[in-house]
Each structure stands twice: as structure tokens, then as C-alpha cells.
Regions:
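Serine-dependent protease modules
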Residues: 1-245
Length: 245
């Protein structure tokens, strides 16, 4: 079953590379004291707290991560921290074909970004894509599959189970992470977590680790959270929320 899922869904998972003209210098907080208050182990500022402010340093900076196609027209979901402040975003498909991508919309509060592949004139490719599932139906203990690009090793497939639901890790007001022991590492960020039907149930986002490597505790944004804001990201490029005042 897992072999079938990997063969069928791998072509819809993409390698995301972001290039920045300026890369912020970031300091690391002591990992032993505050393992949740360190820069994200995925190599970009992630949901485990904000690094200490520091001036911009001249010079190029590159970020890498994962994304996945959600329709035949080339829309891609990934993490906001993978492409945040990027000047150029490049997508590499399973067949090694490269495209530039446009940032359609992003939401830092949920760490979700929507990209779209920029086609050349006359390119009518129907891209392979993943079907979005229902994360409300996810059960603790069910098997899951993660696909991503850990350490640049593209289209790596790992398996595990759902370890917990609605996990709060102190990242913000939208903490409802799915916890999994499927192996995810730097470069997996933005990739899909799939159920045994091959449907996306979450976006792999972060890990708990004192070393920066996988220890079997990964966190995934429930896909329903992305589905809820998808239309708004397409239309407005951002999410507008109400407030009391």
C-alpha cells in the first residue's frame, strides 16, 4: 500500500528553492534550556519562536523546502517560512523540470503560503496534484506517509503514525498541530503528510529536537486549516481576520 502511495503521489511533490538578496543573521538560543524557543530546525524562522532581532547582512541567502501541487493549473501549498521574503522562488518537479513560481498569498500566523508555477507561453501542462483530505477525521494511531526533500534528498518517503492531535507547542493562537513520528528533517518543511488513501491531511512544518535532527516528534499543520484560507489567499493574497475593539 505504501509503495502504491509513493508511486502515485511523488510526482505531485515539489522541491522549493527560495533566493534572497539579503539574509538576516540569526543567533541561536541555548538549545538545552529552551528547545521550543530556537530558530526552526528547517533552516528558516519557524513556529518555535522568533530569533533575536539582528541587522541584515549583505549577500545572497538560499532556502530550501518542499511543497505540493493542489491542482492541474500549478497551484502549490508550502510553508510561509520556506518562501518568506524571497526574491526568486524556483520549483523542481519529480521529472527534474524547473519552473519559477509566483507567491500568490501567504499567512504568517498559520505559516501557510500559496504559490503558482509560472508557465512559459504555450505551456499547457496539466500538472499532477494531490487531493486534500479531512484532517478532522484523522485518528491517533493511524498510519501516515511523509514525502519531502530532507537535506536536499528529493522525494524521500517516510512512514509513521499520528502520535497526537491538536497539539499546542506555544507557537501562536492557531496551535492545533498533528504530531507524528514519521521521520521529517530539515528540508521537509512544507511537504505533505498523507493518509493511507494518499490524501493530504497536513503540511509538515517543524520538529521538536535538541540536536536539530529527527527524534520522532514532528508537527504538521492540519490541512483543514489551509483549506479554510485557500480561497482568500487566491483572491486577496492574505488573510484578513476580525478583532474586538
Amino acid at each position: 500500500l505504501i509503495v502504491d502511495i509513493a508511486k502515485k503521489q511523488n510526482p505531485a511533490v515539489v522541491f522549493v528553492t527560495s533566493k534572497k538578496k539579503f539574509q538576516p543573521a540569526r543567533g541561536n538560543l541555548p538549545q538545552q534550556r529552551k528547545p521550543f524557543r530556537q530558530p526552526s530546525p528547517f533552516g528558516q524562522p519557524g513556529p518555535f519562536g522568533s530569533p533575536s532581532p539582528s541587522p541584515q547582512q549583505p549577500g545572497p541567502g538560499n532556502g530550501t523546502g518542499t511543497g505540493f501541487l493542489i491542482d492541474k493549473d500549478g497551484y502549490i501549498l508550502t510553508n510561509n517560512h520556506v518562501v518568506d521574503n524571497a526574491d526568486v522562488i524556483k520549483i523542481t518537479l519529480d521529472n527534474e523540470k524547473e519552473y519559477e513560481a509566483e507567491l500568490i498569498g501567504s499567512d504568517s500566523k498559520t505559516d501557510i503560503a500559496l504559490l503558482k508555477i509560472m508557465r512559459q507561453p504555450g505551456d499547457n501542462t496539466n500538472f499532477p496534484y494531490l487531493e486534500l483530505g479531512d484532517s478532522k477525521k484523522v485518528e491517533v494511531g493511524e498510519w501516515v506517509v511523509a514525502i519531502g526533500n530532507p537535506f536536499g534528498l528529493d522525494h524521500t518517503v517516510t512512514t509513521g503514525v499520528v502520535s497526537a492531535k491538536a497539539r499546542n507547542i506555544g507557537a501562536g493562537p492557531y496551535d492545533e498541530y498533528i504530531q507524528t513520528d514519521a521521520s521529517i528533517n530539515p528540508g521537509n518543511s512544507g511537504g505533505p503528510l498523507l493518509d493511507m488513501e494518499g490524501k493530504v491531511i497536513g503540511i509538515n512544518t517543524a520538529i521538536y529536537s535538541r540536536t536539530g535532527g529527527n527524534v520522532g516528534i514532528g508537527f504538521t499543520i492540519p490541512i483543514n486549516m489551509a483549506s479554510d484560507i485557500l480561497d482568500e489567499l487566491k483572491k486577496d493574497g492574505k488573510v484578513t481576520r476580525g478583532w474586538l475593539g
